[in-house]
Amino acid sequence: MKQKNVLGTDLEICNENPMTGFFRDGCCNTNEMDVGSHTVCVIVTKEFLEFSKSKGNDLTTPRPEYDFPGLNPGDGWCLCAARWLEAEDEGCAPRVKLLSTNEKALEIIEIEKLKKYQIDLN
């Protein structure tokens, strides 16, 4: 059964190049093993990548041992909900694809905050 997005419809693909998601399936699917709640589909920016690196999570450096190519501004990525909220508090939250953001993100982030940063609904 497909997981749902924050709008209650089927969760859509976030990104497949680079492959994202806790399960590396391109979607922000989650389960109880995903303690970081990698549920928010974002389009990363230079500012966010610098912020993440300053917090000890370098997303730009390739890590071949994890089949991770490193991210560049403009890449889609399933981000930990708490990290997105922290970035929002710091003024550098990346934009969000609501149709690709798992409903589980709502356990940590209010829908109205996510909607302020949405890029896929017009």
What are the functions of these language-model segments?
Residues 43-58:
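Short, basic/aromatic beta-hairpin or loop at an interaction surface
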Residues 84-107:
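Short, compositionally biased
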Residues 60-67:
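Short alpha-helix capping/helix-loop boundary micro-motifs
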Residues 102-122:
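Glycine- and charge-enriched low-complexity intrinsically disordered segments
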Residues 1-47, 118-120:
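Extended boundary segments
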